[in-house]
Design a protein with these regions (language model features):
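N-terminal lobe/hinge region of extracytoplasmic solute-binding protein
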Residues: 30-80, 109, 167
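Append "and occasionally in soluble cytosolic enzymes with long acidic Gly/Pro-rich linkers
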Residues: 264-349, 353-354, 414, 440
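Extracytoplasmic/peripheral linker and loop segments enriched in polar/acidic and small residues
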Residues: 357-368, 396-465
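Gly/Pro-rich hinge or "lid" segments in bacterial periplasmic/extracellular proteins
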Residues: 43, 64-65, 143-196, 200, ...
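Ligand-site clamp/hinge motif
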Residues: 190-233
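Surface-exposed binding/hinge segments that line
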Residues: 77-78, 82, 119-159
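Long beta-strand-rich cores associated with HINT superfamily self-processing modules
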Residues: 461-485
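Ligand/substrate-recognition segments at binding pockets and active sites
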Residues: 322-387, 459
């Protein structure tokens, strides 16, 4: 009798497969932080956008050469400060409604009403709907800047349903968000680029980098974002795992609150800059896999200038510090991240050598973002992705007076020359002249040190060797629509 039931069970399983009910293909991805919301317009942190990138699409994306090309756009033309664009026809939202010009207009206007993304659509003066599939955007600035801005993952085109729930056109649709620690997406069979080969994506929050590696090794997950440089070595001896590492658009930096004494003193910030041993940070924390930074923006970003940074010079730093007779104490804020804590420890030791006592304060990410936006800090260690591949998105949010606080300028820096150069660069039609303005900005920042760039981030992705079709994105929002497992 037992043999009969065993044979019957196997028969039922085979019958399910034959009838088109195979086991679902699931891929699990480990993130360092929880996604904050499925709304890409309101939260631009890398974990949120890593997830929402799979749910929504952009009008434009960047190719491997940092050139803008259409995603939802079939073709476009530029005349002076005006862009005319034709939408691809037949693209469906996940509720079955077709993409049209009115929805695109509403989505961009929504971006304009939200402070954190407003900076990206500021160049838009007016949006005109010509017909169901054609739009005209009139800009107040250089059109090229807007095109690059529209590639940012927070510029995804969204549609609100009758319950105000956001819907996208992406390869996967939201099944479960919960607290953000476990997010489940299911494939969109009507995806305009073709139905994904994976049925379910699960994004799991695994805060510690070594634990992400262990989860990958035990096949609890199949893809791990942001593998630590120390764990990279382990991949060399693995027959099942491989590491993908490329220069990202990200820069780790020290941001100094220029409104708080004594750090409002330019000379003190200069001493701090000379005292930080960036080479040691790269060697000890990143095992020389990253690159010492001389700018907020990375070398693969338009507008980058290879200006020599202030080299580590302890004697110069000590010489400047002779002017300060009273002890100096500062708090250095970081969010929960192993490499940020290690970086803070090295900076703490560096500054102790010149008489500055640094106390490290570790905060949960949401508290860190909220309190630093309010200017409660002395200094912080941050990471910024110039995700558009254009210097405007590196410099304008981090340095312009209009961007103070939550938009990005957490150093509360206000330099009229820098403000003017940024405004002029947005209006300048010639790329070479724009580059000259960004070069001058970089020189001013290296002189005044409101932000001290430390290293350019190399992004390490650990994947199971059975994963095929993974597409690396230098902004950290990797594309999973074509993966197979």
């Amino acid at each position: 009798m037992k043999s009969f039931f065993k044979i019957f069970t196997i028969f039922i399983l085979l019958l399910n497969i034959a009838l088109g009910n195979p086991e679902k293909k699931i891929v699990k991805i480990g993130l360092g932080y929880s996604g904050r919301s499925y709304d890409p317009h309101k939260h631009t942190d890398s974990s949120t956008l890593a997830i929402t990138k799979q749910i929504y699409n952009n009008l434009f994306i960047l190719d491997n050469e940092n050139e803008v090309k259409g995603e939802l756009i079939e073709n476009y033309s530029i005349k002076n400060n005006t862009i005319e664009m034709d939408l691809k026809k037949g693209i469906l939202f996940q509720d079955g409604e077709e993409l049209n010009s009115e929805i695109v207009k509403k989505s961009l206007e929504r971006n304009k009403s939200i402070p954190v993304t407003k900076v990206l659509v500021d160049p838009i003066e007016k949006i005109e709907v010509i017909d169901k599939y054609k739009l005209r955007i009139i800009c107040t600035t250089n059109v090229d800047i807007l095109l690059h801005n529209l590639t940012h993952s927070s510029m995804a085109i969204v549609k609100e349903d009758k319950n105000k729930k956001l819907i996208g056109t992406g390869a996967f649709k939201l099944l479960e968000w919960g607290t953000g620690e476990k997010v489940i997406l299911e494939k969109n069979d009507n995806y305009f680029k073709g139905s994904p080969k994976i049925d379910i994506l699960e994004f799991l929050t695994i805060p510690e980098a070594p634990n992400r590696y262990i989860a990958l090794e035990t096949n609890e997950i199949q893809i791990a974002y942001d593998i630590s440089s120390i764990d990279v070595k382990a991949f060399k001896n693995s027959k099942d795992l491989e590491i993908l590492n490329k220069l990202s658009y990200g820069t780790d930096f020290l941001s100094i609150n220029t409104e708080k004494a004594p750090l409002n003193d330019k000379r003190l910030r200069e001493a701090i800059s000379y005292a930080i041993d960036k080479d040691s940070i790269n060697e000890v924390i990143f095992e020389n896999t990253s690159k010492v930074a001389n700018s907020i923006i990375t070398p693969n970003t338009f507008g980058y200038s290879n200006k020599e940074e202030k080299k580590y010079n302890l004697e110069k730093a000590k010489q400047i510090m002779k002017d300060y007779k009273t002890p100096i104490e500062i708090e250095l804020w970081i969010y929960e991240d192993t490499s940020k804590y290690q970086m803070a420890q090295i900076i703490q030791a560096n500054l102790k050598e010149i008489g500055i006592d640094v106390k490290i304060q570790t905060l949960e990410l949401s508290s860190f973002l909220q309190l630093t936006a309010q200017g409660k800090h002395n200094a912080l260690i941050g990471l910024w992705y110039t995700s558009t591949g254009d210097a405007d998105y590196g410099y304008y949010p981090l340095l312009h007076n209009n961007s103070r606080g939550g938009v990005g300028n957490r150093s509360f820096y206000n330099n009229q020359r820098v403000n003017t150069l940024l405004d002029e660069a947005r209006k300048e039609p010639l790329k070479e002249k724009r580059k000259e303005k960004y070069k001058e900005i970089q020189e001013i920042i290296l002189d005044e040190n409101p932000i001290i760039p430390i290293v350019y981030k190399t992004y390490n992705i650990g994947i199971n060797k059975n994963i095929k079709g993974f597409k690396f994105n230098p902004n950290g929002n990797h594309i999973l629509e074509n993966i197979e497992y």
